[in-house]
Amino acid sequence: MMMVARVATAEHVGSAGASLPQTPGSRSFALGAHPGPQKRIGGPAQGQTAFITPLVTPDGIYSRPSSPYMQASPLLKGSESGGSAGSPQSPDAPSSASGASVGNAIGSGYTGNVSVAIRIKPSESSTKDPWYASNDRLIHTEFGEFQFDHVFTKGVCNQEVYQALGVPIIDKLFEGYNATIFAYGMTGSGKTFTMSGNKQEPGLIPQCVGNIFDRISSEHHGASLAYEVKVSYLEIYNEKIYDLLNYVDRQAGSTGQPSRNATGLKIRDDSKYGVKVVDLTEQLVSSHEDVMKWIATGDRNRKTGETDFNTRSSRSHAIVLLRLTRYDLKTGSEATSTLSLCDLAGSERAVTQIVRRKEGAFINKSLLALGTVIAKLSMLGSQANGLQPSPAAGHIPYRDSKLTRILQPALTGDSIITTICTIDSKAESSTETTNTVRFASRAKNIALNVRKNEMDSHAEKDTIIQNLRKQLDEQHETIVMLRRSAAAPSGNGSTSPLDSPGVGGTSLSERTHNMEKGLLEVENSILKTKLEHCEKLLDKDMMVLEDPHVREIVEMLPLDIASVLESKVQGMESQLRQYRVYVQKLESDLLKAQRNIITTHSVQFNRQSTANVQEKYGSDVDIELLLEEQEAELMELRNALKRKDKMIEALQSARRLRDSALSPTTTVLLQRKESVIDPRDPQPV
């Protein structure tokens, strides 16, 4: 027994970013509820099909006869969950947010609403269509009038769609904004044709790619900018993500389908892109032909199948990612912007085939999650426009599906988004068309602030780097010159400044080397002295107490107390002796170092003054550097002397502390000693 259940049709709602600037022929309207009276005429009863008289013909507009059914319009349900987003509006009603979808560039950001376009699929049926378009308005006598940024009628070609939607998106892409275009609609309504097209009539994807490389070619003539383009292609099939450009995952067979493992690719949070598909292939491309070749490869790997509406229908959501990186060759900075071109699978009713029913369930689940996200964002947009806040606008469930998870950065203000919703105006598709229009109405209510991926000039940092590089080059040249002059004398027999003889017949380079060697030996000796000092402090000093008063006090105390006190005093005296020896050693080393420096200075400049050296050899950088090094060494020795003084002060403080600790004990012992009666003293009578 086979159970055939109807899969819940999504009240789909699409991805949102920020709207595009106003283009020729486009108008933006607020979709708030019409304050005036509305005509509410219901549709057909459940299970019945209504064949409605056409509202527009080549000869004009006809009035529609009254419907025998007086039920509430299903479109009015949108006002219950989505505020005014799903409510029709009279053409004469005032717009509370007129021009909301027209973005405004403020500083380094972009504000506006989602740009929404409707495209009506041409119908060959003789049945009269209930929907018609007029001046970017979609009109249905029962449901009312809906106004969008663009409404493309049946005679509009892909080139016109691209001029209205694609060109502004590419302009914003080159300004540094991320951009997203996605097609939404029921199965067989023309989404894939709008996005991909055919050889005779290319769709949005090939035309956007061509425009990108045309812009790169025109802007590349200036030598200050360089561009890099990478392409990726993924699909979401049965809530799993697959890489359509990964040849490794292809099965060895004639099916031509990629192997779909049990897990698919994973999504991870990314600091740069918001979210990132791990291990997704990125192919570097250099021309329009390269991109289309990779997209064709992905199309062959994409999962398709036959449905009731199409012989070759998309059974997965497909997303083409184009990453455009712009390099400023003058400053070395870069900026990356991403164009996402999404062809979403269409919702459909359950079918009898098990595979198709499973695919449809996953598709409807993801579209339903997308619809929920859009509905909540629409509520937030209504609150931003000053309308009454809705209690349902709380947590936004981006993680309910892979589709909403990937679109999360765009929906949260990381991308300018244009949505093109394709509908079939036939009466047989009335339910799906109604859901699509409700989706478009809610999406248009979303307001976002899009961040711009600006090229960080770092002017101050670049100046510092240039100065440091210049200084490094100068020092490198000086070092090379010194090494050459120290290696061999010049060809005319003259000696270099470093090789000029000084006192004792030694050259300056030799004296410098000897001085450095002496300083290293002094430093090594000081370190050895410190090590010996620390080792001695670890050993317990068992020398007899030198202070006779302290020895007398210790002898008068009980044995246990006397031993403890003697041990403590011995340790303190041992430390004092070690400190004295250490201080004397430091003073001796410091005196020797000062004498060596004075001697070195006299050796260097004894026979010739600084003025004579400069007169003979010009501005001698070597001597200046040597003087600077000696100044630094002298400063280190002075610091060592300061540390010695601080150490002496610490020892003196410890001595005072010891004296203060022993003074009460000494007083008590002396008093006790005086109280003892000496037998030799005369006894009182």
From Swiss-Prot:
Q: Where is this region: Disordered?
A: 11-46, 63-101, 485-510
**GO molecular-function terms, A-Z:** ATP binding; ATP hydrolysis activity; microtubule binding; microtubule motor activity; microtubule plus end polymerase; plus-end-directed microtubule motor activity
Per the record, the coiled-coil ranges are: 464-486, 520-663
Alphabetical UniProt keywords: ATP-binding, Cell cycle, Cell division, Coiled coil, Cytoplasm, Cytoskeleton, Microtubule, Mitosis, Motor protein, Nucleotide-binding
- Subcellular location as annotated: Cytoplasm, Cytoskeleton
GO biological-process terms attached to the record: cell division; microtubule polymerization; microtubule-based movement; negative regulation of microtubule depolymerization; nuclear migration along microtubule
Q: Could you name the Gene Ontology cellular component terms for this entry?
A: cortical microtubule plus-end; cytoplasm; kinesin complex; microtubule; spindle pole body
Segments of skewed composition (Low complexity): 86-101
Q: Which residues form the Kinesin motor domain?
A: 113-446
PROSITE patterns given in the database record: KINESIN_MOTOR_1, KINESIN_MOTOR_2
Binding annotation for ATP? G185, M186, T187, G188, S189, G190, K191, T192
Q: Which family does it belong to?
A: Belongs to the TRAFAC class myosin-kinesin ATPase superfamily. Kinesin family.
What is the role of the protein in this entry? Required for assembly of the mitotic spindle.
Name listed for the protein in its UniProt record:
Kinesin-like protein KIP2
Q: Which organism is it from?
A: Eremothecium gossypii (strain ATCC 10895 / CBS 109.51 / FGSC 9923 / NRRL Y-1056) (Yeast)
